[in-house]
A protein has these predicted regions:
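Long, well-structured alpha-helical subdomains associated
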Residues: 124-152
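Surface-exposed helix-capping loop/turn segments at secondary-structure junctions
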Residues: 2, 29-35, 95-97, 131-139
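Short active-site segment of divalent metal-dependent hydrolases/proteases
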Residues: 82-90
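Post-HEXXH active-site segment of zinc metalloproteases
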Residues: 75-79, 91-122
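Auxiliary, metal-adjacent structural segments of Zn-dependent hydrolase domains
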Residues: 2-61
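Short, contiguous pre-domain boundary segments
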Residues: 2-5, 98-105, 145
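Short pre-active-site segment immediately N-terminal to the catalytic Zn-binding motif
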Residues: 64-81
């Protein structure tokens, strides 16, 4: 099952959409989501001008992954999605409600949230790399077979 995409930003997602769904399917195969999230693409030009502005967030109440799109490379947006998909799984497992401080600088002040963030950073990047490498290997294999057939 693919995830729903909401394009509030009005950007052209044709090239990216196959990777959003493909990456989601790869993560689902590895993790086993009980419910798909909704991918929401948002525009915030003011945020885009900030060097350390927001890139994405996960809303555990609505199961939505929000991605800010302004001025970003598609692969960077996919990295944000990968990270937030891990938070989605953490939410489905009931692990996001750790209590403690949730305000500015929570990563430094809340060890429970810090551990969840570290998991999202490492596991999200790991699964995205697997997805990317599998696509590249599949493409190489198709090209090798084509070359082999052309030589006969």
């Amino acid at each position: 099952m693919d995830c729903k995409i909401v394009n509030n930003a009005g950007i052209d997602l044709r090239d990216m959409e196959q990777h959003i769904h493909g990456m989601y399917r790869h993560f689902d195969k590895q993790i086993g989501f009980k419910k798909p999230p909704v991918m929401v693409f948002d525009s915030d030009p003011g945020n885009a001008t900030k060097t350390l502005g927001k890139t994405a967030y996960y809303d555990p109440q609505t199961f939505e992954v929000h991605v800010y799109v302004d001025g970003r490379h598609p692969k960077d947006m996919l990295r944000s999605i990968a990270h937030e998909l891990i938070h989605h799984q953490q939410n489905l497992e009931g692990r996001l409600d750790v209590g403690g401080y949730h305000g500015e600088g929570y990563y430094l002040k809340n060890k429970g949230l810090q551990k969840l963030e570290q998991e999202a950073m490492s596991r999200g990047n790991e699964l995205m790399r697997e997805y990317e490498d599998q696509l590249k290997l599949k493409k190489e294999n198709k090209m090798s077979i084509k070359d082999w057939k052309n030589k006969e």
